[in-house]
């Protein structure tokens, strides 16, 4: 977005906020669900990776930071390689991702209280999409990842996680 477009958007938002009748202000971005905050561990026995193989260990830690969430993903692969991916994000905007060469940005979209989608991109091109669903009992989470490859097999992973702590450093 260019400077002129950015200024126009800021002016439009400021105008809408000051001219809306009291009690009818523009809606704030959706808040991140409390269900997400905590530590989640890969349940490899329930997970499926196509074409595979997936990581042998993975822990996802989600921490609330103001209105945003900090996501920390730590993985160990069968060949011993380790990966640590980090991002701070909220809904409806693109945020930078660190720790992987596969994608450099994430855009989150809230579907409902327990479901959200993420578009992962690299250099402005979509790398893949992930749909995260937290179970109603808040004890498990499923992430379905899809990526269409132009040169090789497409990717379709259904990955299950068990909540192991409500907050980092605390048992469930």
Enumerate the language-model features and the residues they cover.
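N-terminal secretory signal peptides that target proteins for export/translocation
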Residues: 1-3
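Bacterial N-terminal signal peptides
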Residues: 8-17
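Juxtamembrane cytosolic interface motif at the C-terminal end of transmembrane helices
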Residues: 18-22
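Hydrophobic small-molecule pocket/channel-lining residues, especially in calycin-type beta-barrels
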Residues: 23-172
């Amino acid at each position: 977005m260019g400077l002129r477009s950015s200024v126009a958007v800021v002016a439009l938002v400021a105008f809408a906020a000051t001219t809306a009748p009291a009690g009818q202000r523009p809606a704030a971005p959706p808040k991140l669900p409390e269900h997400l905050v905590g530590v989640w561990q890969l349940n490899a026995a329930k997970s499926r990776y196509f074409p595979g193989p997936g990581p042998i260990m993975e822990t996802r830690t989600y921490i609330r930071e103001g209105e945003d969430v900090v996501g920390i993903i730590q993985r160990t692969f069968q060949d011993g390689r380790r990966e640590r991916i980090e991002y701070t994000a909220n809904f409806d905007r693109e945020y930078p991702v660190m720790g992987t060469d596969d994608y450099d940005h994430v855009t989150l979209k809230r579907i409902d209280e327990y479901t959200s989608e993420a578009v992962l991109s690299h250099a402005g091109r979509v790398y893949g999409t992930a749909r995260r669903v937290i179970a109603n009992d808040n004890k498990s989470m499923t992430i379905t990842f899809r990526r269409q490859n132009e040169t090789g097999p497409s990717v379709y992973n259904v990955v299950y996680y068990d909540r192991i702590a409500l907050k980092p450093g605390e048992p469930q």
